[in-house]
């Protein structure tokens, strides 16, 4: 969960406290359009894994706030994809793609 530095992506859970993110300038999820990953389109937001790692390691309150924004957006988007797949009668294909993506890893 966000308060413990766990961020959810379509390719699995990302543990932002891990040292490998110390210099990683990529967003949490390059396909995500949330404020934490992509910003507001006007120069605000769009934080790197390295910056979130730094905030988390320093105990800054902004770290779990940004992680929560991302995680909520992830689940809202995931549930919309589930509803769309069910409505279109292609949930089986969605489920397979979801499992393949998660197995790929972050």
Where are these regions (language model features)?
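Alpha/beta catalytic cores of nucleotide-metabolism and tRNA/nucleoside-modifying enzymes
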Residues: 1-106
């Amino acid at each position: 969960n966000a308060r413990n530095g766990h961020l959810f992506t379509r390719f699995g859970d990302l543990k932002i406290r891990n040292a490998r993110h110390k210099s990683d300038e990529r967003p949490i999820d390059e396909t995500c359009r949330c404020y934490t990953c992509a910003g507001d389109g006007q120069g605000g937001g769009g934080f790197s894994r390295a910056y979130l790692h730094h905030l988390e390691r320093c105990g800054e309150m902004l770290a779990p706030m940004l992680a929560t924004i991302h995680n909520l957006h992830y689940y809202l988007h995931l549930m919309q994809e589930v509803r769309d797949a069910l409505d279109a009668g292609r949930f089986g294909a969605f489920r397979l793609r979801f499992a393949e993506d998660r197995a790929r890893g972050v």
